[in-house]
Amino acid sequence: MKLPGNRDKKIIDGTHRIVFYLLPLLGLAFLLWYIKNAACDVVYSDYIRLVNSYLPDVFNPEKFFVADVLTRIPINYLSRIINVKFFGFSITFDRVLGAVSVSLAAWCFAAYSRQLKINIKWFITFMIVMFSLNKWEMLTNGSGWSHFFAFACFYYHQILFDRYYRGQERKWDKTILMLLPWLIILGTAG
């Protein structure tokens, strides 16, 4: 017996389409509100080590090539330079990057859910998990934003791979599929 679902529909109606676009944006707004109200821009925990190691000279590559896994991630090095030069080293900058990265991952889930015509109730459940309490804790801790960004990149890679596998690839999908793993692994995973 076959159960009816959204996959049987040829077109997702307008209300569902809006929900797929709106929930990741609402999640971002919620995370930014949470960061504003639950944390202050003060150096603590992981950041004490980062401040002592990097702030005197953020352009020094010798400080980048050390044994610490969090500091060897190239995207962290780049964001730290931007943070120091434009914001005078603000912890909130890293937290906002984390919120944006979680929302990018949620957007990838939304795109994949639209592509597969996932039932809207399941999509809402995915979004609840995506913006759940474990993300809030990691956001206020701060330095884990690059991990959220890596998740978003991996999810995007899965979307492209699935599209290619089903024979629905777009013009640049094959090229991006060949380059993206290198960029993800070397840029966001160290």
Question: What does each model-found stretch correspond to?
Answer:
Residues 1-31:
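Start-transfer (signal-anchor) and selected internal transmembrane alpha helices
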Residues 30-51:
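Helix-to-loop transition at the C-terminal end of transmembrane segments
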Residues 65-89:
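Short hydrophobic/aromatic helix or loop-helix immediately within or flanking a transmembrane segment
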Residues 96-122, 156-160:
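Transmembrane-helix motifs of polytopic, lipid-linked glycan transferases
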Residues 113-133, 151-152:
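Transmembrane-helix signature of polytopic, membrane-embedded enzymes
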Residues 136-156:
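Multi-pass, polyprenyl lipid-linked donor-dependent membrane glycosyltransferases
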Residues 154-177:
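Membrane-interface transmembrane helices that cradle and orient dolichyl/undecaprenyl
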Residues 173-190:
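Membrane-interface alpha helices of multi-pass inner-membrane proteins
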